[in-house]
Design a protein with these regions (language model features):
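Hydrophobic helical h-region of N-terminal Sec-dependent signal peptides
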Residues: 20-21, 25
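N-terminal amphipathic/basic-hydrophobic helices that include classical n-h-c signal peptides
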Residues: 1-8, 633-635
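C-terminal motif of bacterial Sec signal peptides marking the signal peptidase cleavage site
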Residues: 28-29
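Short, compositionally stereotyped local motifs that mark structural "simplifiers"
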Residues: 530-636
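Mature catalytic domains of secreted/periplasmic carbohydrate-active enzymes
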Residues: 34-441, 445-474, 478-502, 512-523, ...
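Short, conserved beta-strand segments of beta-strand-rich sandwich/propeller modules, principally
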Residues: 457, 506-510, 599-603
Length: 636
């Protein structure tokens, strides 16, 4: 996306803000009118030349901006995934493509219930698996019988995507579609089209089907083989008959391939851009996979990233799983620099598809809320899967988690404690179209509230459509006891960064930009308070007799990774314990490291903000040197 001078002049205000703070006194800010620090045209993609130096590459990186569609997708922040299909009834994660359509034995459907629950969670869009890898379609396609039209649901006339589209309109949710390029039915069926070695010939999209005319009379001519024609005919259906589509999701997973089948992605892209100009494309140049399916996030998630070939023309988009994608070191290896945001995706259940309510565990509210803060507050979008059950509804446990997550989001992020504060108006007006340019000599922003406020969350946004994501390192300070005290640090900011830290009470806060790529433009800061609570604890002893006291981990066994959820959410708690049977208090010994204990009763409690958590107690029997002991069950 190019930004010319006319566009820049439309920005309401741009200021160079340098704040000077003396002992106990806030001086007036130096606020000279200024434009963004631009030395090149801002673009979505910029080529690296052989003559470029590390310095000129960083200059180019500082001018990479999201497209309008990418920016709208970033504003969605929290979105839903829905995996539904034959796998829901066979209890499989991946089907084989040869399932009898009648295994999809759906009797009732309540997409209003889906949308009501998603809306309650604070989600803004839902992406629906219209066709998963098994090739089974959940809409009334003209081009196959392998789908819902061959089931008993509503006598073969049901259309789940149509129901969902209507519910999205009713509840104010955007709609996206997942259409798997992989198609096991078209691979395994004797007359299947996938990899059938058909010649590429000029073909019209959509292909006419007697008795099923399209209201949209747009047509395309492409050189296609049989499978690409089939795939694009179905894309045409999805993009023209189910309301505005805001995202098209192409999964890179392929359970099986055949016949050297290739995809004509340039044709797919042309069709999408023509029929759904507002849509972003996942798995291609607009949005990338985060690199895992567990909800794990990078500490530094750059969206300005290097490419070995032009992402605007290539059809090859490999998965990016490295921890470091966009550092200076990585960018200097590039042939092209490109803006491409990540979706942090995972499932609320153990698996993408629903299996049961007894053994398939559901993520805790703490877990989902923690991922939300790390993803949305870490320069990415949170995509959470909620699989409907065999009754066509979200299960009660899933709905309960969604509602509580939405409640926490509202309770935490509704009241901005910087409202009414003194500071740059452009940062406090709740308008991301206004901004200040920070630097170059004094990269500090000071905000003063009328009265002391207690906060533990601080939100920062860069004006990334104006001058890219530039901040590389920053810190937040609070004025406490007549001195600045650092309370949190972070690396990049980009679209949004949420800093989390223990409760701090002050009426003066300072944001310091420590490192950046040219002068960054900051468009918003806000301060919030999360109702942190002392976490539950557990006591363990190893075979050497060393006792550890830690936060209790949720029992969730799907795509796990190391993450102390309780500590992330409730920063600043302390653990106190006793070994003599007495009830622990704030005066009891503080737990800081494992300790040796031959036998005895360990009682422990977490304390946070003068609040006391549940007491955890465990009787440890005499240690057996062969590694066995008389340890009794955990008691509450």
């Amino acid at each position: 996306m190019n930004h010319n001078i006319n566009h820049l002049q439309k920005m309401k205000r741009t200021f160079l803000y340098s704040s000077l703070f003396g002992v106990g006194m806030l001086f007036a800010a130096c606020a000279e009118k200024s434009r963004p620090d631009l030395t090149l045209p801002c673009q979505n993609t910029i080529a690296i030349e052989s003559t470029d130096t590390p310095e000129s590459i960083m200059e180019k990186a500082a001018h990479i901006v999201p497209s309008p569609m990418q920016m709208e997708a970033l504003k969605n922040e929290f979105i839903a995934f829905i995996h539904f299909g034959p796998n829901t009834f066979t209890r499989m994660e991946w089907g084989n493509g040869m399932e009898d359509p009648r295994v999809f034995d759906l009797k009732q459907l309540d997409t209003d219930q889906w949308c009501e629950a998603m809306k309650a969670a604070g989600m803004k869009m839902v992406i629906f698996t219209a066709k998963h890898h098994d090739g089974f379609v959940l809409w009334q396609s003209r081009y196959t019988r392998h789908g819902i039209m061959s089931t008993d649901f509503r006598e073969g006339k049901g259309d789940i995507l149509k129901d969902l589209s209507a519910s999205c309109q009713k509840y104010g949710l955007k709609l996206g579609v997942y259409l798997s390029p992989a198609d096991l039915y078209q691979i395994e069926h004797p007359q299947g089209l996938y990899g059938n070695l058909s010649p590429y010939t000029e073909r019209t999209i959509p292909r006419e089907v007697p008795g099923r005319p399209f209201a949209n009379k747009t047509t395309f001519r492409f050189m296609l083989d049989d499978y690409n024609e089939y795939f694009m005919n179905q894309l045409f259906e999805l993009l023209t008959e189910y309301g505005p589509i805001h995202e098209v999701w192409f999964d890179g997973a392929h359970p099986k391939r055949k016949g050297g089948q290739r995809y004509n992605y340039p044709a797919w892209k042309e069709l999408i851009h023509k029929l759904a100009p507002q849509a972003v494309i996942f798995g291609r140049e607009d949005i990338r996979w985060c690199g895992n399916e567990s909800g794990k996030t990078r500490d530094t998630e750059w969206n300005v990233i290097p490419y070995p070939e032009n992402p605007d023309t290539t059809s090859h988009f490999p998965d990016m799983t490295d921890e470091d994608l966009g550092s200076r070191t990585q960018l200097c290896k590039a042939k092209y620099l490109h803006y491409q945001q990540a979706e942090t995706n995972t499932s609320i259940r153990e698996g993408w598809f629903y299996r049961d309510d007894d053994r398939q565990r559901v993520r805790s509210v703490d877990d989902v809320f923690d991922i939300y803060e790390r993803a949305v507050g870490g320069n990415s979008t949170f995509l959470l899967n909620i699989p409907p059950n065999r009754e066509g509804r979200f299960s009660a446990q899933d709905v309960s988690v969604l509602k509580e997550v939405g409640k926490r989001i509202n309770q935490t992020y509704t009241t901005d404690y910087l409202q009414g504060a003194e500071g740059p108006e452009e940062l406090l007006d709740n308008n991301t179209d206004t901004y200040i340019v920070v630097g170059p000599d004094k990269k500090e922003i000071v905000i003063e509230t009328p009265d002391p406020v207690t906060i533990n969350r601080f939100l920062i946004q860069e004006a990334i459509t104006v001058s890219s994501e530039r901040v590389e390192k920053h810190a937040l300070d609070a004025w406490i006891d007549n001195a600045w005290q650092e309370v949190a640090t972070g690396t990049n900011i980009g679209y949004k960064r949420i800093l989390r830290f223990p409760d701090v009470t002050s009426n003066k806060f300072r944001l310091r930009i420590l490192e950046s790529r040219m002068k960054p433009a900051i468009c918003q800061v806000a301060a919030y308070h999360y109702a942190a609570r002392p976490p539950r604890l557990e006591v363990k002893r190893n075979t050497e007799g060393n006792v550890t006291i830690s936060t209790m981990q949720q029992k969730f066994g799907w795509k796990t990774y190391t993450q102390d959820i309780a500590r992330n959410l409730n920063a600043g708690f302390k653990i106190h314990y006793t070994t003599d049977g007495s009830t622990p208090t704030a005066e009891s010994k503080e737990y800081t490291q494992p300790f040796a204990l031959e036998s005895g009763m360990v009682k422990a409690v977490a304390l946070l903000n003068n609040e006391k958590g549940e007491v955890c107690q465990q009787q440890l029997g005499t240690l057996k040197r062969n590694g066995r002991s008389n340890r009794k069950d955990l008691l509450w």
